[in-house]
Amino acid sequence: MAFAAPLLTLVALVVKLSSRGPVIYAQRRVGLDRRDGTRPTLGDRRGLDLGGRPFTIYKFRTMYAGAGRRSRQVWTRRNDRRITPVGRVLRAYHLDEIPQLVNVFKGDMNVVGPRPEQPEIFARLREQLDRFPERQRIRPGITGLAQVRCGYGGTPAEVERKLQHDLEYVSRRSFWLDMAVLLRTIPVVLTRRGAR
């Protein structure tokens, strides 16, 4: 974390000076499913039936303050008006994800793993895709096989394709696969592929 301190400080300063609101954005996500099959499914405060433990994810704020509360839209779209100009740059280079290192140190996430979803999205995808909860057998990650192969996608076909990559990662998970994903993450970040 110390190696990232200068970058974290610079990004935090730019976010703070560019628009009103907090520097860090916190949001509930669905994490590792720690159940052994004997306990009921965990839910969050809204009563959603989740296949994993909810946790708070941290990111640099890339949207105007309160944009999430004013909109019913859950997934971001290309040219989303809720995103600040600085936020577009942060998202393009995935710099908004850096605070998730805190989640890694807390044990909520790994560096590599399936992308953690918001409870509402998780509940919807679990209804649509039978195998979706299988992703929760491991901790979610900052980057993952689906992210480097597919980027960001919200269409049903893209979501299903990403699920197949997540399940492949869950079944083949190893040190060497993690290294391969990390190496493939570098060009994704540098070429701004998959950012919204």
What are these regions (language model features)?
Residues 65-74:
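A short, polar/charged loop-to-alpha-helix boundary motif
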Residues 12, 25, 84-88, 165:
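Positions in alpha-helical segments
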Residues 1-66, 175, 180-196:
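A hydrophobic, helix-centered structural microdomain
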Residues 129-196:
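C-terminal terminal-structure detector
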Residues 65, 116, 151-153:
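Solvent-exposed coil/turn segments that connect beta secondary-structure elements
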Residues 13, 59, 82-85, 100, ...:
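Residue-level recognition of specific faces of alpha-helices
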Residues 73-82, 157-161:
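The feature captures the short pre-catalytic strand/loop hairpin that immediately precedes
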Residues 1, 76-139, 181-189:
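A short, structured surface patch at a secondary-structure boundary
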